[in-house]
Amino acid sequence: MFDLDPINAAFYDQIKDLPCPHQMGGYQQAYDSLEQIQKHDAAPDIDTTTIQVGKRYGPTTVTLFRLKTLVDKPLPMVFYTHGGGWIMGSAKSFAVLMEDLARRTQAVIVFPDYTRVPHQTFPYPLEQSYEVLDYMVRHSNQHQILHGTIALAGDSVGGHMAIAMMQMSLERKLPTQIGQLVLWAPVTITYKKLGSYTTFSHAPFLTEDSMDWMIESFLPNKEDRQTALASPLTHLSDEVLAQFPPTIIFLSTVDPLLDEGVAFGHRLQKNGVDASIMKAEGQMHAFCAVKALRDGPTARAVIDLAALRLRRIFPQRDTPGHPS
């Protein structure tokens, strides 16, 4: 039915008869389901530290991932906002990807545990995440983070949030340089659907009905959906887009979010941004984050490229025994 590579096809066979998130009986059940799928033992080479950040929108739990061999050294920062439909996801369910990025970039991965639906809706998690970003930049020395160029990254709705972080950083004059934006299948429009929603309406791991449920839950006020923060594809100005840093967008070819990711990349390119659009053939949504998929050859290659793009903006560090 879907053109998936063997690893993705095998995983699809395992999950195809299971309920989708919107069919699980509630927000907590959907959250618990992803936590179960993503159970993971902490990597022995990665230091994981949690801190509490923020007053107006916090306190927010923030997890810092870094190599244990570099724990006493100041490192550059990758600020990562996670996917999960604004409903699911945590530092635990995304740990395997965060550990890998920390290992491959030799940076500190800053992971805000923003407040999810139903406890908060738009724009609270965006403001909350920006409060964390602003704090980490202004108090970098307290957390062994290099003051200088940083990177933003995120997947799915976390990619949507990373775009918002970039927009807010420009508008609010965040006192740092953002040198790279890395996005996996970002949500870029929330008030209408592009063609891939029809083509992949019943795609594995993310369906049209699930996305409808997520958007309606996060953005219950339909007027909010036609704003720059909610739908940057159509409502973010050319003037702001032209100020975006080099951006790489990784997309799955079997994903309802495919077309809006391509379209957002094209808008960046038309505004002179060094933007790359990479389609991963035979991959379903979240193929780099899902534990059962991320060891496939395409996922490994994408993570390698993402880490390379991140590392090239940071000061180079020679650490024997760890991959570049």
From Swiss-Prot:
Q: What induces it?
A: Expression is induced in response to 2-benzoxasolinone (BOA) exposure. Expression is also induced in response to 6-methoxy-2-benzoxazolinone (MBOA) and 2-aminophenol (2-AP) treatment.
| Gene3D superfamilies, sorted | alpha/beta hydrolase (3.40.50.1820)
Q: Which residues participate directly in catalysis?
A: S156, D255, H285
Q: Where is the signal peptide?
A: none
Q: Which InterPro entries match?
A: AB_hydrolase_3 (IPR013094), AB_hydrolase_fold (IPR029058), GDXG_lipolytic_enzyme (IPR050300)
Q: Which UniProt keywords apply?
A: Hydrolase
Q: Name one GO molecular function term.
A: hydrolase activity
Q: Does the keyword Transmembrane apply?
A: no
This protein's source sits in the domain of life called Eukaryota
- Name the top EC class: hydrolase
Which Pfam family, giving just one, matches this sequence?
Abhydrolase_3
Q: What is its EC number?
A: 3.1.1.-
Effect of a null allele: Does not affect tolerance to benzoxazolinone.
Q: Which PANTHER family match?
A: AB HYDROLASE SUPERFAMILY PROTEIN C4A8.06C (PTHR48081), ALPHA_BETA HYDROLASE FOLD-3 DOMAIN-CONTAINING PROTEIN-RELATED (PTHR48081:SF8)
Family to which the UniProt record says this protein belongs: Belongs to the AB hydrolase 3 family.
What does the record give as the function of this protein? Esterase; part of the Fusarium detoxification of benzoxazolinone cluster involved in the degradation of benzoxazolinones produced by the host plant. Maize, wheat, and rye produce the 2 benzoxazinone phytoanticipins 2,4-dihy-droxy-7-methoxy-1,4-benzoxazin-3-one (DIMBOA) and 2,4-dihydroxy-1,4-benzoxazin-3-one (DIBOA) that, due to their inherent instability once released, spontaneously degrade to the more stable corresponding benzoxazolinones, 6-methoxy-2-benzoxazolinone (MBOA) and 2-benzoxazolinone (BOA), respectively.
Q: What is this protein called?
A: Esterase FPSE_08126
The species this protein belongs to is Fusarium pseudograminearum (strain CS3096)
Taxonomic classification, please?
A: Eukaryota, Fungi, Dikarya, Ascomycota, Pezizomycotina
